[in-house]
C-alpha cells in the first residue's frame, strides 16, 4: 500500500533550502566545509530525482501490486474531480490491497492536462481526467460539450452522456490508444471579469482566458472578446497581473482556485458544461487480468455514480462560499440570459460538421425532456 510521503517531501524542502543558502547573496557563498556541501548537494540531487521521476512512485506500493498513477490538476478536498479521485484511490487501495495500488497526483504535481495524455500513451501514468476540451487532437466529437448553451442544465448533460450517443463517444479514441472510462461532472460554467458582466457586449475588447478549444475561442469572439489560451495553473496569476481580464469556469473552480479574489464579480450564466473524461491507455487496460480489470471497473463505476450525483451540491456550496468570502455573484433575468443565448448560439453552425447535426438534434431532444 501507499505510505505517507510528508516526511519524504519535507526532506526535499530542507535540502533545497540548504542549497539556496549558499547563493543567498548572489556572489561567493558563505563558508561551508566542502565535504558538507557535497553531502548536501548529493542528497538533494538524489531525493529530487526520486521526486520527479514518475516511475519511482512504484516504490511506495507492495511488491507484486499493479501500480495505478492518477494525475489531475485540481485540489483534493473542495473540487468534484479531486474528491472523486481521492475516493477512488481509497477504495482501490482498500478493496484491491495486494493486487493493485493507486496514487493520486493532484494540482498538476505530475503532469498538467496538456501533457498527461502523451505521458499516458508512453505508459508513465495510467489514469487522467482532463476536461473534455483537451481531447481535440484525438477526436472532434467532444466539441459538442463546449458549444455554448447546448445543454439546458446538468440533468440534460447527464442524460446525453448516458445515452447511446454519449456512451459511444467513450470509444471514439481507441484507434489512438485511449479508452474513455466515464464522465465526471464538475458543473455548469459561469463568466467572471474585471468589470461587471450583465450582457455579452460588456465583454467587448476584454481578454478572456480559454482552454485549448477552437469552440471556446469562437464563443469568446462572438462576444467581441479576445480569447487567450492559458493553462489552468496560470489563470489566477494571469487575472491578478492583468494578462487576462476574465475567464469562464464552474463555481468549484472559481472558489477552489480563488479566481473571485481577483475579479469584479461572477455572472451566473450557466452557458456551458465543464466535465471531465476519465481516460486510460487501452493497452494497459486490456493487459490486466480479467478479474483485476472487472473489479477495478466496478469500483470506478460506483465512484462515478456517487460523485456525479453529489457534484451539484458541491458546486452550490462553493457558490455560497464565494458569497460568504465577499465575492460578488450576479444573477440574470430570463430576458437577460436570452441575450447571451442569442449572441452565442450562432457558434453552433461553425462546428456542425465536427459534432454532427444528428448529435446536436439528440442533445436538443434531451433538453426538452429535462
Regions found by a protein language model. Give the residues of each.
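Short, low-complexity disordered leader/linker segments with a strong preference
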Residues: 1-67, 370
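N-terminal secretory/targeting leader peptides
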Residues: 34, 60-156, 165-167, 173-370
Amino acid at each position: 500500500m501507499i505510505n505517507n510521503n510528508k516526511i519524504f517531501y519535507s526532506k526535499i524542502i530542507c535540502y533545497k533550502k540548504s542549497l539556496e543558502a549558499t547563493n543567498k547573496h548572489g556572489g561567493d557563498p558563505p563558508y561551508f566545509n566542502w565535504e558538507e556541501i557535497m553531502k548536501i548537494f548529493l542528497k538533494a540531487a538524489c531525493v529530487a530525482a526520486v521526486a520527479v521521476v514518475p516511475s519511482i512512485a512504484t516504490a511506495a506500493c507492495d511488491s507484486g501490486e499493479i501500480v495505478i498513477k492518477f494525475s489531475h490538476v485540481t485540489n483534493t478536498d473542495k473540487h468534484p474531480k479531486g474528491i472523486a479521485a481521492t475516493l477512488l484511490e481509497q477504495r482501490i487501495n482498500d478493496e484491491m490491497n495486494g493486487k493493485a495500488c493507486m496514487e493520486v497526483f493532484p494540482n498538476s504535481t505530475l503532469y498538467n492536462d496538456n501533457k498527461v495524455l502523451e505521458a499516458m500513451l508512453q505508459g508513465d501514468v495510467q489514469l487522467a481526467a482532463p476536461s473534455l476540451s483537451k481531447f481535440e487532437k484525438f477526436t472532434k466529437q467532444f466539441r459538442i460539450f463546449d458549444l455554448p448553451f447546448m445543454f439546458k442544465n446538468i440533468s440534460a448533460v447527464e442524460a446525453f452522456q448516458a445515452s447511446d450517443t454519449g456512451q459511444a463517444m467513450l470509444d471514439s479514441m481507441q484507434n489512438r490508444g485511449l479508452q474513455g472510462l466515464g464522465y465526471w461532472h464538475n458543473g455548469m460554467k459561469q463568466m467572471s471579469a474585471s468589470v461587471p458582466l450583465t450582457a455579452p457586449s460588456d465583454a467587448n475588447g476584454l481578454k478572456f482566458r480559454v482552454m485549448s478549444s477552437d469552440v471556446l475561442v469562437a464563443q469568446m469572439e462572438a462576444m467581441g472578446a479576445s480569447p487567450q489560451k492559458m493553462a489552468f495553473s496560470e489563470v489566477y496569476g494571469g487575472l491578478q497581473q492583468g494578462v487576462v481580464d476574465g475567464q469562464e469556469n464552474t463555481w468549484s473552480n472559481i472558489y477552489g482556485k480563488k479566481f473571485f479574489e481577483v475579479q469584479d464579480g461572477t455572472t451566473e450564466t450557466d452557458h456551458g458544461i465543464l466535465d471531465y473524461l476519465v481516460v486510460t491507455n487501452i493497452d494497459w487496460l486490456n493487459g490486466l487480468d480479467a478479474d483485476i480489470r472487472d473489479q477495478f471497473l466496478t469500483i470506478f463505476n460506483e465512484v462515478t455514480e456517487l460523485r456525479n450525483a453529489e457534484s451539484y451540491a458541491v458546486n452550490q456550496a462553493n457558490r455560497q462560499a464565494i458569497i460568504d468570502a465577499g465575492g460578488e455573484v450576479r444573477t440574470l433575468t430570463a430576458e437577460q440570459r436570452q441575450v447571451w443565448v442569442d449572441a452565442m448560439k450562432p457558434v453552433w453552425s461553425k462546428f456542425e460538421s465536427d459534432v454532427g447535426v444528428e448529435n446536436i438534434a439528440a442533445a436538443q431532444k434531451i433538453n426538452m425532456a429535462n
